[in-house]
Amino acid sequence: MLKRCILAENRKLHASPIWAMFFVLPILSATYGTFNYLQNLEILTDGWYSLWTQHTLFYSMFFFPAMVATYAAYLWRLEHLGHNWNLIMASPVPPLDLFAAKFAVVTKLALLTHGFVFALFVFCGKVFAHLPGLPPVTLPLFLLRGLLGALAVIAAQLVLAMVIRSFAMPIFLGLLGGITGIFISSKGFGLLWPYSLMQLGMNSNKSADALAGSYGLFAFSCIFWLGTMFLLAWLLLKKRDVRA
């Protein structure tokens, strides 16, 4: 049943307007990051690492939470129309399978987005910043860590989009979560807030490894928040009545 749900969710993406955002927002983020890097070369002297911080800081703080929030709201949009929710709750599909299917599809989109962001990073580094060689091997590792941290954000946004019928409100809350995440991280409590995990994983605000000596805690926090969001979704869906 889960496989059928995933196929159904994938069909929603065919000719979807969210693909325009998929391309536009990473390009905007890369443009801003590259411009900021080129304007501060006297300060940002660590080559590929410095460019990485400029590319990923605003991406992880603003653009990615907004994109994931939009993906999640779009996938829940059909269920919130008319009486579709009641029909779905009365269907033989296990409610958590529906949530898990949406999670799988948004995770796929996030993986594609991360790949596109890294391709833009390399392109801008070579073409505009004229950096020598190729990016250090640690940067793809940061990207993978960021994807692990992003899973908690994806699950959180799916819960918000599930319980809030408004399309715009979950997106606003996603942006708010990303903004608060950077401040919480700056105070040293990033592992306690799901929206900080991707920023920490991607090492988006410093050249030195922000997770040095804390990989275990980072993995635990990612798993904890992911499990918490799935448990919350299960409890809400168990009531078979999610309202705005």
Predicted features and spans:
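Cytoplasmic juxtamembrane interface segments
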Residues: 1-7, 76-89, 147-170
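Aromatic- and glycine-rich beta-strand/loop motifs that create alpha-glucan
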Residues: 1-26, 242
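Terminal transmembrane helical anchor/hairpin motif
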Residues: 35-52, 171-244
